[in-house]
Amino acid sequence: MDYVTLGRTEIKVCKNGFGALPIQRISFDSAKEILLHAYNSGINFFDTARFYTDSEEKIGYALSDVRDKIYIATKTAAQNADDFWKDLNTSLNNMKTDYIDIYQFHNPSFCPKPNDGTGLYEAMLEAKAQGKIRFIGLTNHRLAVAQEAIDSGLYDTIQFPFCYLATDKDIAIVENCKKNNLGFIAMKGLSGGLITNSAAAYAFMAQYDNVPVSYTHLRAHETRRHL
């Protein structure tokens, strides 16, 4: 299993991360079996979101006993500080943990910054000061927002769609993250199932030594076959 260091966080994660969106569609016991199989196969990075219904609860159900051996990233789509704290505390409770390794703004239409009127980034800083989160991340599908986050110097990680269908502008996001020592996390490594040649997809990703992939495209019952 190959590992990647996420920029200045110094978090070392396996090249293949576990995107936990699909496990919301299966039972708790089935999810536990898959999650533990992933962990026992060497996967140490699990990415979920408050928006993914019971995905966080299933991670807590399956992995709480090995919490100190894994890295968890989750996300909030909150639009204000009050909802931010509700999401964060719910996520902590769901996953049976007192901290989140990477807490991410979930595909916002803008790049949250201090004094932007939302209170979101200030809430992130307070959560970090309280020890509830370790690092601050942002996920996005918009080139302009992702690049603004990189340029801002406010973020530790960026999660962005990336696969062998990537444009030159997409590749520039990856390169700019490396240049600025930000962790880059690829999502949609098989373009949501559009790419069926997994060997070619892996070969493309192997060109980039700073890119782990959070695979969320798999139907949950197929996940074990691909680990």
PLM ranges: what are they?
Residues N44-R50, A73-T74, R134-G137, T157-F160, ...:
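Short catalytic-loop micro-motif centered on adjacent basic/acidic residues
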Residues D209-N210:
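A glycine-centered loop/beta-turn motif at secondary-structure junctions
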Residues I26-D29, L36, Q79-I185, L190-G193:
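Glycine/proline-rich, positively charged
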Residues A199-F204:
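Catalytic cores of alpha/beta
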Residues I59-A62, A146-A149, R224-L227:
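Hydrophobic packing residues within well-ordered alpha-helices of enzyme cores
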Residues T216-T223:
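Conserved small/polar residues in nucleotide/adenosyl-binding loops
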Residues M1-I70:
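N-terminal binding-site loop/beta-alpha segment at the start of enzyme catalytic domains
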Residues I11, I23, T76, F162, ...:
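Hydrophobic pocket-lining residues within nucleotide cofactor-binding pockets
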